[in-house]
């Protein structure tokens, strides 16, 4: 069976539970081998933040500084698969100073899971990451309200956050995000539907990811858009920008706009690995 591949990212503010969610997802989809699980148990005792319980975030936080500080710094890529689809997920950092690492993860993603802490709701970094996802043309946005166990799985709290986010999404032009209440640490609504939130009638997070339609991926008919990942300056006579085109096409002498400044310029030359 030739299964489709979905690239997605997890993003949101610091401590909203991104790494824990993904660690749980990897564990539940049998993407963790027995030796990895043994190491996870040992690391949980040494570095964990969950007492005697397994700290699933440690499956993603690979740098020693990340484990010791309990944070994500670099973008961690992981692969897993189900009977229906293959996935490559980028776990991106929530701290403001690592935002450019998050943007790198967003530049190749088909979908984004934007996490929020049910106790805190929308924060500045939630908005920043949401705007970056929208700017990079990510069409499939899933807003996951995490840590629902800490608000006693309260339906009204979830609904209030949904309404707040809908207003924000409309203000930046984001269309039709999906919403799901979850608990990454307890596995509620991650792989299977939660018994603790029977009031929520939607599918699990994994089912939402499996059902994303990739047929509407960006085509050449749409305007040219390229997230800049590197400014090339090998010498004082040359300055170029590198990145992956995510829509449209570009030709020499075409006028382009640079965001967020909105300044306009023209394409002087297009250079590929084979030359101009």
Annotate the PLM regions.
Residues 85-87, 92-98, 106-130, 134-159:
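Conserved Switch II/interswitch segment of TRAFAC-class P-loop GTPases
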Residues 159, 166-276:
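Conserved catalytic-core segments of large NTP-driven translation/proteostasis enzymes
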Residues 1-100, 109, 144:
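P-loop NTPase switch module centered on the Walker A-proximal segment
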Residues 18, 34-35, 123-124, 150-155, ...:
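Switch/connector loops and helix/strand junctions flanking conserved nucleotide-binding motifs
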């Amino acid at each position: 069976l030739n299964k489709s591949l979905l690239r997605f990212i997890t993003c949101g503010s610091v401590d909203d539970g991104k790494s824990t969610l993904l660690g749980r997802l990897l564990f539940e989809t049998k993407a963790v081998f027995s030796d990895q699980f043994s190491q996870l148990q040992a690391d949980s005792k040494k570095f964990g933040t969950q007492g005697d319980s397994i700290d699933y975030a440690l499956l993603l936080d690979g740098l020693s500084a990340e484990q010791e500080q309990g944070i994500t710094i670099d973008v961690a890529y992981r692969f897993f698969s189900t009977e229906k689809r293959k996935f490559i997920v980028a776990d991106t950092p929530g701290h403001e100073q690592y935002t450019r690492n998050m943007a790198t993860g967003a530049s190749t993603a088909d979908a984004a899971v934007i996490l929020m802490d049910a106790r805190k709701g929308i924060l500045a970094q939630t908005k920043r990451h949401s705007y970056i996802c929208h700017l990079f043309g990510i069409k499939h946005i899933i807003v996951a309200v995490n840590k629902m166990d800490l608000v006693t799985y309260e339906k009204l709290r979830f609904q209030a956050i949904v309404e707040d986010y809908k207003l924000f999404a409309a203000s930046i032009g984001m269309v039709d995000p999906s919403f799901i209440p979850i608990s990454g640490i307890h596995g509620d609504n991650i792989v299977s539907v939660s018994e603790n939130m029977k009031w929520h009638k939607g599918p699990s997070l994994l089912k939402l990811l499996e059902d994303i339609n990739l047929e509407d991926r960006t085509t050449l008919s749409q305007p040219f858009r390229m997230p800049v990942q590197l400014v090339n300056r090998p010498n004082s006579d040359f300055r170029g920008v590198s990145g992956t085109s995510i829509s449209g096409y570009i030709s020499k002498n075409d006028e382009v706009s640079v965001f967020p400044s909105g300044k306009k310029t023209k394409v002087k030359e297009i250079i590929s690995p084979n030359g101009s």
